[in-house]
């Protein structure tokens, strides 16, 4: 059976769109510190905290965090928890000074950042964030009931990333199969 040129073109477009969609699901996110305002600077008030802002976001392994600041006047230091808590700028794990720093979050667990400018960390220019493990599901299981008669019920197992990715391959297979059919 021969395909007309327009049907073949339509099938190709569907296949390409499907591939783009699948790759977008696996793409890493870039998150700018501070959200839309995007400025790495001393917070405007003592009630604002970069860490509280970060707690509203979900960071996963492979994401990037972007710091925007005036090069030459400020910097970003990646530090240990102890250095973060004491605003100690000596011996950072990493020192960034380019004005638009993009840090890859390459592991799960906590990350700590402080300003390298004198006195800025003490005025609140610091950020701690937690990167979730690839094992964690984006969807949290429902809470268990408070009272039990026969014993506690098990929470449903979280859906792993490999199961979600496997579902994407099924969709891709269906689309490609439909393309071959027409």
UniProtKB/Swiss-Prot annotation:
Its main location: membrane. A lipid is attached at residue 160 (GPI-anchor amidated serine). One of its GO terms (molecular function) is electron transfer activity. It holds the Pfam family Cu_bind_like. It is found in: Cell membrane. Disruption phenotype: No visible phenotype. Plants lacking ENODL11, ENODL12, ENODL13, ENODL14 and ENODL15 have a reduced seed set due to aborted ovules as a result of pollen tubes failling to rupture and release their sperm cell cargo. Disulfide bonds join 87-121. Residues 1-28 form the signal peptide. SUPFAM superfamilies: Cupredoxins. Interacts strongly and specifically with the extracellular domain of FERONIA at the synergid cell surface. Belongs to the early nodulin-like (ENODL) family. This is Early nodulin-like protein 14.
